Structure formats: C-alpha cells, structure tokens
Design a protein with these regions (language model features):
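Short secondary-structure junctions
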Residues: 174-184, 274-287
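Ser/Thr-rich, low-complexity intrinsically disordered terminal regions
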Residues: 283-304
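A polyanion-binding, active-site-adjacent surface
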Residues: 2-158, 164-170, 203-204
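Intrinsically disordered, low-complexity regulatory segments enriched in Ser/Thr/Pro
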Residues: 55-61, 298-321
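Amphipathic alpha-helical segments
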Residues: 258-279
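C-terminal capping/extension of enzyme domains
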Residues: 1-22, 133-145, 167-261, 315-316
C-alpha cells in the first residue's frame, strides 16, 4: 500500500474512535495539516506535535461526516475567505520557523507536503487544563495510540513536541535533557524516530532562548540518524550554551539597570508634581500615582498618571470625563 492508502485505513479506525468518544464527551475534534498532500516520493522531514486543538467547541457532527475528512486537516482554516487559511501564517508555526531559523533549518517548514503539524490528541479544549477531566483523560490515553500509528505510517525524519506532560511524556516512556537544566530540549526515540521536546511555541520565548534551541536542534538533526549520547552532545554544545548564558545575563543586567532608571524617573516626577507644581493626588497605590490639574471650579480636569510597575512603566496625561 502507498502512504495515502495507509492513511485512509488509519482514518477509518481513528474516525470511528474519535467520533464516538467526542459525541460522548461533547467535545470537538480535528487534525491540523492536510494529510492528503503527502506522497511516497517526498518523505516527511519534520512532524510537529502539539498538545491538542485549542478552539474548544462542543461536538459538531457535520464537521467530520466521514473518515476521509479527518485527513484534510483543520476544516475551519480551509474555509473560503478565512484569513488563517495558510498554515504557514499560524503563530505556532511562525514562531517555530523563527527558532529553527537560528540553526538555518527554518526551511523545513516551507512545504506542507514535507512537514506535518498534528496533535498528541485530537480532542479540542479551550485550554490544556480541559484535558484534566477524568473522562477526557481516559479517552486521551487511548487516543495516543492512534497518534503513534500515524507516526508509524508517516515515518518523519524528526519529530518536535510542543509542551510536556500532555505531549512528549505521553508518547515516550523516557527522555533525556540534551541541554541539562539550561533550557528545555528533551530527547527520546519512538520506533527509531528521534523526538525532541521544547517549550510550546505559543508561550514567551526570549531571543537568546530561541537562538540556543534552534542551533542545538540543527546539530541534533545532523547526527540523530543514530542515538544521541547526552554527555557528548552537551559537551559539543558548550559554546552555544555559554553564549546563551552571557546574553541572558546581559539582558538581565540591562533590565535591572532600566528598572533602576525608572525608579529614579518615577520618584523624581512624583516629587516634582507634588512639591514643585503643587498638584493634588488623584489616586495612589503601590508604584502608581495620579495627580490632577483642577479647572476653575476646582474639579479634576487633567489627570497625570505615573506608573512604575512590572510590565507597565509609563507616564500618561488624559482629560477627566
């Protein structure tokens, strides 16, 4: 059988399981990439596995009327006029491409027939915590076997898992941290295929973290045709690890210096408004003070706001309504 015949046979049994369980759990379910694009003459270079679809709608029978629909991917993104029609513009794909770009392997995500985006389980929940429900958890454990079968059919050269306990930890019994405790880059093997676990690309990534993981993955991809030895890989990666630590420390130092400067600015402006201009305090809380300039009737006409809080360091002026 060719790969499309194998995928159709897989879809028959996967659809039977998911449609019944999704109806019982009242959960939506779907895949991501269009698997009908895969061919035997173009092997898949990279499979990217997320946790689960995050839309979180209830069960919708019309979305997948037959097993073949499961192969066509996220049908919402296929709708005419949808601005997210192009899978390459999805945030998690763009972020991953940026990460891999530091290792000059971002082009692995340029051809949907050469890479596959899927999920460890196809049940959709608004947040990952939706998988903690006992009945969903039981169904999730069974669903992983269909994901493993999909991996076995596609046989990608490399797999990247986004997230931890509900992704890579469900697929593999044991993993190794290739970069130690410096940055998350887990490694394991499933049926001879190298698997890497990184932080989910929907979360925050510092630039130096993206650079380290991207360059480390490039080196790993070059040698993972045989099992990777953790000790050897870590030693080979000391140059990029040291570069990461230096950049992280430099950034922390800059952030600390910036915080000190803002403390000075905040204190100076607060004192100037209060003592030099004689403005009255409108509102005051920790590291946030507002002063008002009264109109002819003594009402607060113009508000000057000074803020020196984490994530918000600003000076603002507004008219009181």
């Amino acid at each position: 059988m060719n790969i499309q015949e194998k995928l159709r046979a897989w879809a028959d049994v996967a659809y039977d399981f998911y449609s019944k369980e999704a109806y019982t759990l009242d959960l939506d379910f779907y895949t991501q990439s269009d698997l009908t694009l895969l061919t035997d003459d173009k092997p898949v270079e990279l499979m990217v596995i997320g946790i689960n679809p995050g839309h979180g709608r209830n069960y919708q029978e019309e979305r997948f009327a037959k097993p073949e629909d499961l192969l066509r991917g996220n049908c919402d993104f296929k709708k005419e006029g949808n601005p997210h029609l192009n899978i390459f513009e999805w945030h998690i794909v763009r972020r991953l491409r940026s990460i891999l770009g530091y290792g000059k392997i971002g082009d692995l995500l340029n051809d949907e027939s050469r890479f596959v985006l899927t999920n460890a389980t196809f049940f959709s929940t608004p947040k990952e915590t939706g998988l903690d429900d006992l009945k969903v958890k039981e169904a999730q454990k069974v669903s992983i076997e269909y994901t493993k079968k999909l991996i076995d059919i596609i046989r990608p050269k490399h797999i990247i898992c986004l997230g931890g306990k509900n992704c890579m930890n469900l697929l593999l019994d044991s993993t190794t941290r290739l970069l130690g405790d410096v940055v998350k880059l887990d490694y394991g093997v499933i049926d001879g295929i190298p698997v890497y676990g990184i932080e989910h690309t929907s979360s925050f990534w510092a630039r130096e973290q993206m650079e380290l993981v991207g360059k480390a993955l490039e080196r790993a991809f070059e040698q993972d045709h045989v099992p990777i030895d953790y000790g050897e890989f870590y030693n080979q990666s000391k140059d990029i690890i040291e570069s990461f630590i230096k950049k992280r420390n430099d950034r922390d130092e800059i952030e600390h210096e910036t915080a000190l400067r803002w403390e000075y600015i905040y204190a100076s402006l607060s004192n100037y408004c209060k003592y030099n201009l004689g403005l009255e305090v409108f509102e005051e809380s920790k590291d946030s003070t507002s002063f008002y300039i009264p109109d002819e009737e003594g009402k607060s006409d113009i508000i000057i706001s000074l803020v020196n809080q984490k994530g918000d360091k600003s000076v603002g002026v507004r008219y009181s309504i």
